[in-house]
Amino acid sequence: MSSILIAVIAIAALALVFGLILGFASIKFKVESDPIVEQIDAILPQTQCGQCGYPGCKPYAEAIANGDMINKCPPGGQATIEKLADLMGVDVPSSAHDEEKSIKKVAFIHEDMCIGCTKCIQACPVDAIVGGTKALHTVIESECTGCDLCVAPCPTDCIEMIPVKTTPDNWKWDLNTIPVVNISTDQPSKSSEL
């Protein structure tokens, strides 16, 4: 047999053995997790911003499952709070966040002050900042969650958090206040026409 064929057979045998070992280990050492934690974690926005006081969304999901408040996630907003309340079977808190945090904000980079250090890009958990080394950076407003993690690392203080401009697309339309009236139609039935 040629040396290439022997090498291929040896590598295939090693791959098979290691695959079996990993498969056995994954079954043997499987960690059972609480399904409610997984459901809560799926609802959270996964920005890992830390505004809730926990190092990420998974630890916050575990805290909610253990009875912590459901309204500590500013990037998730009111929609996330309502989904969490529905899942946990609790009432939606009347004031989700304090007044200052309830106004959605996004990062804004003053490009005339930006030196292109990329520290804000590295800090952004959702990759909402674009730019390169020694080039100007800008924020993709639709992607920014307002987590405020990019402000502190900036050496020139060229990043500020500004309120989101209200447009017809992001306006909170309250459709429940529109009166709905059922109009009865008094059309004669076919049997009365005969």
Swiss-Prot record:
How the cofactor is bound: the record states:
Binds 3 [4Fe-4S] clusters.
The GO biological-process annotations, alphabetized, read as: electron transport chain
Report a single Gene Ontology molecular function. 4 iron, 4 sulfur cluster binding
Pfam families under this entry? Fer4_21 (PF14697), FeS (PF04060)
Cofactor(s) demanded: [4Fe-4S] cluster
Indicate whether Cell membrane appears among the record's keywords. Answer: yes
- What sequence ranges are listed for the domain 4Fe-4S? 32-90
Location in or out of the cell: Cell inner membrane
Its GO CC terms? Answer: plasma membrane
Keywords noted in UniProt: 4Fe-4S, Cell inner membrane, Cell membrane, Electron transport, Iron, Iron-sulfur, Membrane, Metal-binding, Repeat, Translocase, Transport
Name the protein family. Belongs to the 4Fe4S bacterial-type ferredoxin family. RnfB subfamily.
How does this polypeptide assemble, per the annotation? The complex is composed of six subunits: RnfA, RnfB, RnfC, RnfD, RnfE and RnfG.
Under which name does UniProt file this protein? Ion-translocating oxidoreductase complex subunit B
Biological source species: Aliivibrio fischeri (strain ATCC 700601 / ES114) (Vibrio fischeri)
Upper lineage: Bacteria, Pseudomonadati, Pseudomonadota, Gammaproteobacteria, Vibrionales
